[in-house]
């Protein structure tokens, strides 16, 4: 099947959303599939057996330019959300861990900075993240309350001059074992509001513990606990 002279590819796209992509977007989708087949598939089983992330594939992802795909400016590609979702599906087709890594880095972390950060933060942080030179991790989930950010967070943040003091536990922090930049969500003891605190590695006074057993699906996605 083809559309506007560009051959469609099988993406398990039961509702034919791929037809809504432009030719350029379809070419990128095809390039992602080729990368996952030729670069990721041959190495992923060995990493799966060790529950380690295949960092050697990150340069290839940099060449594809798929981090923070739907965001505009500061080095971000400014592509469609539809393309972003379909690329996530292509990553997960070969291994869910790669989709998790990119979703945490380019979606949760870059998205938080893009939507909630200051102009200075966006200008300073997003370009290097779009190039995968700075890897982001994301700390929301907690052992006792899951991801209940609206009212259940138990981790607290207390302002001390120009710094914040965090107290609490986080669980399943995507990319935290090797990430350069971590966003921690915590409740401000001053006003009870949820704050987004962005810290560079290593977070002072913190302790990271790699979980003893990764789940079977995203087995190579390193998501440690943090205290």
Model-derived segments and their meaning:
Residues 1-24:
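Intrinsic disorder at enzyme termini
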Residues 19-39:
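Mature N-terminal segment immediately following signal peptide/propeptide cleavage
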Residues 152, 202-227:
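Flexible, small-/acidic-enriched active-site or ligand-binding loops
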Residues 155-158:
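A structural signal for short hydrophobic beta-strand segments in well-ordered beta-sheet cores
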Residues 42-64:
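Short secondary-structure junction/hinge motifs that connect adjacent elements
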Residues 144-148, 172-175, 187-188, 214-221:
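Short Gly/Pro-enriched turn/cap motifs at secondary-structure boundaries
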Residues 162-163, 167-208:
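A short core secondary-structure module
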Residues 63-135, 174-181:
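Internal helix-loop-helix
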């Amino acid at each position: 099947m083809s559309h506007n002279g560009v051959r469609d590819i099988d993406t398990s796209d039961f509702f034919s959303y791929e037809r809504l992509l432009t030719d350029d977007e379809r070419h990128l989708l095809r390039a992602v599939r080729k990368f996952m087949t030729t670069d990721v598939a041959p190495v992923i089983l060995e990493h799966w057996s060790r529950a380690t992330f295949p960092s050697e594939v990150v340069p290839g992802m940099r060449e594809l330019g798929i981090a923070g795909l739907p965001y505009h400016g500061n080095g971000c590609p400014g592509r469609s959300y539809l393309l972003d979702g379909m690329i996530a599906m292509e990553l997960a087709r070969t291994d869910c861990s790669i989709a998790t890594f990119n979703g945490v880095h380019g979606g949760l972390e870059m998205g938080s900075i893009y939507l909630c950060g200051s102009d200075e933060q966006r200008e300073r942080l997003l370009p290097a993240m779009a190039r995968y030179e700075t890897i982001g991790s994301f700390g929301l989930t907690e052992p006792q309350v899951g991801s209940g950010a609206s009212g259940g967070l138990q981790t607290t943040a207390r302002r001390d001059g120009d710094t914040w003091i965090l107290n609490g536990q986080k669980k399943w922090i995507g990319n935290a074992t090797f990430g350069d930049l971590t966003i921690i969500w915590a409740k401000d003891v001053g006003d009870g509001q949820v704050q987004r605190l962005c810290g560079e590695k290593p977070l002072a006074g913190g302790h990271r513990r790699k979980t003893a057993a990764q789940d079977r699906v995203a087995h190579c996605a390193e998501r440690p606990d943090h205290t």
